[in-house]
Amino acid sequence: CCSKSHRMRMSRGQQGIGISAAGMYGQLTTGKPVTIISRTGPRAAAHFFEVQIDTKKNEPLVHENKQIEWEQPQGTQVAIEVEGKYQKGRASVDEWLEQTSIANPHVKLTYHTPEGETKEYPRTYHELPPSPREIKPHPYGIEFGMFLKMLQDTKSHSVSGLLASDFCRVSSQLADEICKAAKVSPHTKPRDLKGSSAETLYRTIQDTKIMAPPTNCLSPIGEKAILSGLYKQIKGEFYTAVSRPPAVYRGNPFVIEAGLAYGAAPQDQNKPRQPAMPKAEGERDEEDSELARVIRYANRVPLLYQQSACSTFKAVLSTTWKNYGVTQSRGALPGGPMVIFVHMASVWVPFTSESKEAIADYDEIQKEITLALRECGRRLGLFLRRRERAASEYRRRNIFELYIEEVVEACNRLKGGTLPKEKLKAQLQKIATSRTGGLKTDEALGKTGAGPEGLPHSIIVTAEGVEGEVDLAARVQA
């Protein structure tokens, strides 16, 4: 999202309207001001403010400004008391914080609920994300009205100077070529360019081949951080994450990231299993009828509403999950215990409305989301096929091992009791292991402690432990 001054840099917010609206709502419902404590560093004093909004003049009213003692070395605390109905479940404050914790595993969150509970979302990823750098707007991402405004507001004294200095990826040579193609003098003053001449220049810019904008204005989450966030909050057997290379839509750079958590948490082998209840004819397991859950993000912020209108959700529906061993009805989400994570990082996220609840359909964005989901699905399919083959081989091995003792005893009787039984038992055990996939079977079932071979940026969880790329700092207990 860009700010109102069109700073081309990825950021969580846009124009500060959200915090202003929250403060206004608190003021209207409770009559109490917003309280702010801020300190810029350990050596600086902490300042306390009480602020309200003058609704007639749209100006802040600072009721109190004083220095106080504060235990925090630096940071800002904002407190707003509002009147509202607290509820849990889907699209609630609780879910928003949970999803925020997944996409920001480098952050520690402490949530004090209105019911008196305290929920901790610990920090599990200890690398801070890179700070995005501001870039100049790309010519492809500017609307005609904004282009006209730039012509009037620029400090450049010529059109070619405007193109070269106010846009990224436009050199002086390319600026002269654009002016020549538009039949506009490069030395024309920008303010003198109006009407059809300005429109011709704008169309020429859009038709000119210009290098894609730089991507250092973005700060994607990263595959390891996504894995850490998913593993922290969601119980499962298999996790994977994909970060796509940077792409461009309408001159705006963006990065699509996807993640996937599949399966239920493995049961502890030491705990006694509950006996399975008999099922009526045609009855299915609950997991078989369960649909996947989609969690969507834009610039690390969860999108909880208007799911069906979002480009992310449409890309999930259009992906053929059956190819990866997952059940899916036509036009529906895939079935089974699965959470699908999709994040879009961009300097300008194309939301469908001002409420910023769903991402608009652009072919370039849809393509990148689909490619990321397919890669996640490919890894999931590989895991499921490998696990099924390994489970089959392991069952065969168990059958062989059931008869090893009897074979050893029979051979010992034939030898008149002089056979070295332990040696023969070890040899037969070795044969049974080699004939049923050997170490590959053990690795696929998580019995060796080795990482998931052939599954980059993935985690496999078994009752024996965890394999793959993950920070084992802390896992939130449900």
Task: Locate each region found by the language model.
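GHKL-type ATPase core
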Residues: 2-141, 191-192, 196-201
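Charged, alpha-helix-enriched surfaces in structured cytosolic catalytic cores
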Residues: 12-20, 31, 73, 77, ...
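Structured core elements
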Residues: 18-21, 35, 77-81, 110, ...
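Helix-hairpin-helix
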Residues: 160-181, 478
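Extended, well-ordered alpha-helical scaffold/bundle regions in very large, multi-domain proteins
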Residues: 175, 182-221, 374-407
